[in-house]
Amino acid sequence: MGSQEVLGHAARLASSGLLLQVLFRLITFVLNAFILRFLSKEIVGVVNVRLTLLYSTTLFLAREAFRRACLSGGTQRDWSQTLNLLWLTVPLGVFWSLFLGWIWLQLLEVPDPNVVPHYATGVVLFGLSAVVELLGEPFWVLAQAHMFVKLKVIAESLSVILKSVLTAFLVLWLPHWGLYIFSLAQLFYTTVLVLCYVIYFTKLLGSPESTKLQTLPVSRITDLLPNITRNGAFINWKEAKLTWSFFKQSFLKQILTEGERYVMTFLNVLNFGDQGVYDIVNNLGSLVARLIFQPIEESFYIFFAKVLERGKDATLQKQEDVAVAAAVLESLLKLALLAGLTITVFGFAYSQLALDIYGGTMLSSGSGPVLLRSYCLYVLLLAINGVTECFTFAAMSKEEVDRYNFVMLALSSSFLVLSYLLTRWCGSVGFILANCFNMGIRITQSLCFIHRYYRRSPHRPLAGLHLSPVLLGTFALSGGVTAVSEVFLCCEQGWPARLAHIAVGAFCLGATLGTAFLTETKLIHFLRTQLGVPRRTDKMT
């Protein structure tokens, strides 16, 4: 497969399923906005930070390493032993949920029962929901290994929507239930998620005419249950040792992913109300990153990994592939920079309005607007880092990856310390500032690698980080106009003034996008020829 074909495949992969995800996200966005108007920020903080951290930590400790080990090395293996190994996640999950549940109940600060009722029940049910989700782990890994991509999207999206609907119903009709509401909804979510996989494989394996059965290593649903293999070995010990190696390495990822919640939970730098507001703003701010930047990053990592030879100098590779990779990297950097700048510039003037529409005065009257404005800057760094790291990780040699992991280890430690110090100094904004510092270091590392990689070639993909002076001036003018508009029109003067503020923003956004269309012709050509390629209708795979 040539580099242009790989590029076309990566572009289609980046857009496949995106519409479905946007639809599901939009539904849950509306439901969550409705739910927030009936809750206190203390309950939101306990659920979204404290209890969700218990759930995610249990799942991480019980399954993360198993997933990475069992998805390594392709599909050619003794799947009976692999499935047996995956079933060990269930007793591990029981152990970790009991151990962590004891810590959550006995060692951490317990919320005021008058403000957040039924905390102990919430801890028990969130731990139980993690164990229930682990019951579907063998099905999930089998689906991932055989590229049943849309099954994952539909199962997770359906589960989230039904969870949000149940939560909204209980909050509206039984608000006095407190944490019972979210605990039951979480348990319902994991049950539906597991049932989606079980029902799908039951129907698939019960249909002999299905073409997918030819690629699956099992023929009956009972083959997915634990059993002794033909050679008498219950598990593959090589996979088991690999699992242990991944378990040790995965702590770095967990610290970077959930570091803020660990600092909040164990160091008590914020009260439960501030934790709730921070988590809502964090989820709202990261929505664009999850919907747009993450699919692009994942898909074009595959492109770079297939086109370039890992650890080999650019001058020693096929020059056509190197040129295509450089052109794509330049366009992706430009796209990330433009998207990030747009969010940053317009986010400053519309953060308070967005939070007021989404969650009412609970979000828009306190620290929420400052948090979201700060997060808009962080989104710009997230966008650039996603592109630079997807190239860097695809082109680095194993030794370079090991050195990079060492830097990441130092960054994770500094992030925790910096988060603690900055939150003591400036409150919850300190978490975002610490993330910006962390992301800035990672971007610098990746940019240095890209510069060295193309140093002896005629290609300069980092030119994608340069914008025309006219476009930069348009961004600056738009930022100034919308800032003035916010002062005079938002957000205490009623909906006519708000609509006028929105109209000003729409005009400025149109002018900015029009200027970008006229000045960034190379990027427009890339978007038209690659991301705009017509696609066949995909079947569920």
UniProtKB/Swiss-Prot annotation:
Intramembrane glycolipid transporter that operates in the biosynthetic pathway of dolichol-linked oligosaccharides, the glycan precursors employed in protein asparagine (N)-glycosylation. The sequential addition of sugars to dolichol pyrophosphate produces dolichol-linked oligosaccharides containing fourteen sugars, including two GlcNAcs, nine mannoses and three glucoses. Once assembled, the oligosaccharide is transferred from the lipid to nascent proteins by oligosaccharyltransferases. It comes from Homo sapiens. The keyword Protein biosynthesis does not apply. Belongs to the RFT1 family. It is a multi-pass membrane protein. This is Man(5)GlcNAc(2)-PP-dolichol translocation protein RFT1. Coiled coil: none annotated. Keywords: Congenital disorder of glycosylation, Disease variant, Endoplasmic reticulum, Membrane, Sugar transport, Transmembrane, Transmembrane helix, Transport. The gene is RFT1. It is found in: Endoplasmic reticulum membrane. The chain crosses the membrane at residues 16-36, 42-62, 85-105, 123-143, 155-174, 187-207, 335-355, 376-396, 404-423, 428-450, 470-490, 499-519. One of its GO terms (molecular function) is glycolipid floppase activity. GO terms for cellular component: endoplasmic reticulum membrane. GO terms for biological process: dolichol-linked oligosaccharide biosynthetic process; glycolipid translocation; protein N-linked glycosylation.
